[in-house]
Structures are given as C-alpha cells and as structure tokens.
Amino acid sequence: MMKQPNWLLHRAYVTPERVALIYQDKKWTFRDLADEVNELSNRLAQTSLKKGEAVGLLMNNHPQMVMLVHACFSLGFKIVLLNNKLTKAERRFQLEDVKAAALFTEPVYASDHKGELPVYTMETLPEAGQENVKKIENDFDLNQTATIMYTSGTTGRPKGVEQTFGNHFHSAVSSALNMGLREDDRWLIALPLFHISGLSALFKSVIYGMTVVLHQKFDVDEVIGSIEQHRVTMISVVQTMLSRLLSRLEECPSSLRCLLLGGGPAPLAMLQESKEKGFPVFQSYGMTETCSQIVTLAPEFSVEKLGSAGKPLFGCELKIQDGTRICRPFEHGEIMVKGANVMKGYLYREESTAAAFDQGWLKTGDIGYVDEEGFLFVLDRRSDLIISGGENIYPAEIEAVLLTHSHVKEAGVTGIDDDRWGEVPAAFLVTDHKIPENELYALCESHLAKYKWPASFHFVDELPRNASNKLQRHRLKSKGFLDDSN
C-alpha cells in the first residue's frame, strides 16, 4: 500500500505563508486554508457519514467548494463531482448510480434532490463539536478512489470514472515535468471545478505550493483584469475562451507563460493567430479517464507542428493501433494511452472497464496518427467517422475548413444515409450572416478532396451540445434537428 501525507496538511506545514487561493478580493494562505478546512471537517464529522462512502458535490466555483473538496478528503469520503448544467433527472441518475450517501450543495440546488438522500448546504451543516468525532486522514492511500466524474455520455448512459489519489498525483507531477514550475506561478481557473481540467488545478496547487486564482465563470474582461492584477502565469482554456481572449487582446499579457488548451483540436487559424500575437499556447490532449492532459505540445514546436497535440507527458505512453496491429507513422488508427494517471476503471461496470483496456492500454475511442517524430495528431472520434464509398471521412477536418469562413461561427458535420455511397457528409452551420452555398463549396474545393465535400448545408440557430459543451454530432442527423434547419 503506497501512501502520502494529506496534501493540504503537508503543504500548510511546509509553506504555510504562501498564498494558496485568490477569489475576487480575498486571499488565503495555505495555513488559512488548512485552518478553515479543519473547521469544516469538524462540522462534516458530526454527520452520520462514514469513511469510504461516496458524497455528491454540486456547487459553482467558489472557495467553499475548494474547502469541501479538501474536507471530504480529510474524512475519507469519495467525492462525486456533479455538473450543475445537468437536469435534475441526469443528476439523480448519477447520485443513484454511485450510491451517494449525501449531497453537499448550495441553497439554489438544495430542493432539487430533497427526499432522495440527505442534502447539506454550508448553512445546514451541523455546528462543529469540541473535537472531531471522526479521525482526520493524515495520509492518502494512492490506490484509493478520490473522485468520481461521470463521462459526458455522448453515446449511451454516462459512466462513473474512478480517479485515485495516485492518478491525480502523477497527473500533477507529469504536468510539472512538461511545463516547468516556478515559485511565482499563479494558475487562473475559470473552467468549472466539476470538470477535470478545473479540478486538477486544485490538486496542483497543494502539490506544487502554487496559487490558484479562482473565477466563478469565464468573463473575458474580468479574466484579463485578473491576469494583470495578480500577475497570472498560467491559465486553462478551451477554444471559446481562447477565441475571446484573442479578440480582445492584440498581444499576450507579459506575465502569462502558458495557456493550456484542451477540449479538442483547435482550428489552425486560431493557433496561427495565437502565435502571431505571442500567446504561448500549449495544445493538449486528454480526457476524464486520464485525469486531464496526457499529451501536450510545447510552444517551441508550435510552428513546425501546428495542429499537433504533441507528445506524451513524462511517464506516459502513446501508440496508434488498428485492430491488433501497431500503425506506422501517418497511418490512421485508434489512439491508445498508458500511464499512472490513467483511471482505475468505470465504477460498478466491470465489463465496460475490461472493454476500455487492452493489456494495460486505455482505448480512447479517438482516431489519430503520429508523424515520423512521434507527434500526435488527433483526427476525430471513432464513433463519428463517416465511411463514404469505402473512404474514411473525419468530420473535424471538414469543420476546421468551414470555420475559416469569416461568417461561420460554429460548424458540425455528420454522416447521413445515401443510396449510392452509403453515407455522405452533411454540414450544419451557425452563422452571423447569410452565406451563399457556392461560397462554401468554393472553400471546400480549395481545401478538401471532392469526396469530403458536404452533400448539403443546413443553417441552424445552435448546435446540439452536451453538458460539457462537447458537440453531439449524432444528434445532427435526427429528424427533429433536420426539420429545424433551413
């Protein structure tokens, strides 16, 4: 059994006066944070909850959420991170599936699950006793499940991903070995803490001794102001956030040394603009099952390897496989990864867990290739692949071309049935101006082989996305969605 000292308690012992957290105008040192977490742990200890039980956490980004995470760890509870964008029914499924013993939430959500399980807010938690009635966990078992996050469920029911303390620790260490670590680093988080890209920064904070600058949500003006005021050095972003920063700034703020870009391959035009304006974008590839990034492209390769997700983090491995055969450079296949940051498995789903692994390698379900130097290029989801007349067509490739048009704001491509070819691509576009179809075909003609051209264009008000804001291409072909297009 491999153990480590409780991360927050050890960090508060080693560097007590370092700033741990900044939220709006308030700051907490690691000593302050540990003291407040100890008080909160005492309150949680007055409940009937037992070590090893799973508890739901449904909150917006806020210092209280940070403290609840650490307090739950201190009492040995497994935390189920709930997406506040989900419907009540979707959250209920996850709480029942994980066998949650209680839910910690905010007053705005408290009534949603009343009567289903014990529900606590900061206002309704018992007052602290004179002493803890439960033992504080001074050590973490690295093989123990720390957090459970449900996959987005782009196909079928979502599954609970079991992430261990060891997964989170090795993710943080691999990230530091890849991106470097400085004493003055400050990481801004405006992504939701219920997603791995947000939550992982909390663990990096206590493992590195680094300040987290927390925002409740992404507001471009507030984020820019915060970067300048607090001399932020690192920020986690997705495409939409990076796009807004680029639209507001002509050059990168001087303190920023890393914009960690996740959430899927970025359009080449966006990466090129980032380069021209001096934004140090680290394009990355990862998922809930890998506890955030597992492949990252360092900025020094961003020109010659534009569009690549990079190479595996230190201690991680990558291969491209087609069936049982390892693919050669530039040959397309399924992306498979391995490392100490890869999940324990899917909770209560032995068959799904077994199907997800092949001799210790995680089968990601994504299609990609590596070049002759081992740089990864992510093409698409295997489930979204279009096979037209025997040719493989990747929707993301077509979407990237369509997004280069100045009036196309969002693009989604899916395969629709065709008597002659089996399937043909159909494009769904959100635009800010009417675009003649001949313009779109001319754009495709200059960038794509003819068999990749969309057979039809559909103009819609919005694209279907799940709670994680991921495009749900399979919903594009539904009759209801086709009927709403024009």
UniProtKB/Swiss-Prot annotation:
Its EC number is 6.2.1.26. The keyword ATP-binding applies. It catalyses: 2-succinylbenzoate + ATP + CoA = 2-succinylbenzoyl-CoA + AMP + diphosphate. InterPro entries: AMP-bd_C, AMP-bd_C_sf, AMP-binding_CS, AMP-dep_synth/lig_dom, ANL_N_sf, MenE. Signal peptide: none annotated. One of its GO terms (biological process) is menaquinone biosynthetic process. Keywords: ATP-binding, Ligase, Menaquinone biosynthesis, Nucleotide-binding. Pathway: Quinol/quinone metabolism; 1,4-dihydroxy-2-naphthoate biosynthesis; 1,4-dihydroxy-2-naphthoate from chorismate: step 5/7; Quinol/quinone metabolism; menaquinone biosynthesis. GO terms for molecular function: ATP binding; medium-chain fatty acid-CoA ligase activity; o-succinylbenzoate-CoA ligase activity. The keyword Nucleotide-binding applies. Belongs to the ATP-dependent AMP-binding enzyme family. MenE subfamily. PANTHER family: ACYL-COA SYNTHETASE, MEDIUM-CHAIN ACYL-COA LIGASE ACSF2, MITOCHONDRIAL. Converts 2-succinylbenzoate (OSB) to 2-succinylbenzoyl-CoA (OSB-CoA). This is 2-succinylbenzoate--CoA ligase. It comes from Bacillus pumilus (strain SAFR-032).
